């Protein structure tokens, strides 16, 4: 038995005229406030959690939740915490003014759906029986040299459509149409089946034609490749007989076969090292040109400047001479290890040279400051003596 839906109609009270529907399996709590309740009624005699209505084993049940003023069902007081079955037409009274009428609504929507589906299935079965009753032989069609066979297998939908097309070709569609019209009462099904079958057969024939063209192209490619190979072999044999074969081509082929990936990698590395050498040479030449320009510039001379650190000047001159001598060496004849060792010494000396050039003006300034201070002290001492 199907559980009916519940409809609560408010006959009296603050919500008079309202009607609420609830499906089976739902739980309805009634109280004075909205929080925790599905139905809120602003009545002074209703508790915050007054009663509960729910569906239990195919029946709707009401239960009082220990309210202060109690609940009446058909003028009978309900015991708290005990459930009572509801019936169609029962009246629930709670609070000072509120009364609710209970109605059961049976939903026939599902039953209607089932009957419709059953009718559709019955019509489909009738059509299948009509199609199975027609026994046709295997029909073959030849198009572009291909054999296309239509076999009678009623298990698949496409084969049934093919049967209808075959029956049209043999002139049997009249009887089939009459049977379908007698059972269905309209020509729509026959027309739709015919159009779908024609479209399916056209698509299949086009696919077959495409397959045939692709096969032909593949065969042509294979035949042409074989012919070219044979021609190449014949030409090479003829040239060898006449003594016209190029020796250079044979040597290059042998070299390509002998060489391996490791050797090619080594060649690439050597090329990169030569590039690095060229870059280093260019940098060394630029630095040499800069040093020459710096030497050619006139230095500011001071009459009273006297450099006391003669040992440091000797070091700087020695470093410059060593740098010039080392730059004159031919870097292209060096190995990679010798180049790295040369760069280590050369870069360190170049750094020392640059720092000396930066420190030298600072030393001259400090010397002049010291001389100035000593002169001032001498002047002050003479003034004090006077």
Curated annotation (Swiss-Prot):
Location of the FHA domain:
28-78
Q: Where is the composition biased (Basic and acidic residues)?
A: 292-303
**Segments of this protein annotated with the region Disordered:** 286-311
One matching Pfam family is FHA
> Which species is the source of this protein?
Arabidopsis thaliana
Protein's name according to its UniProt entry: FHA domain-containing protein At4g14490
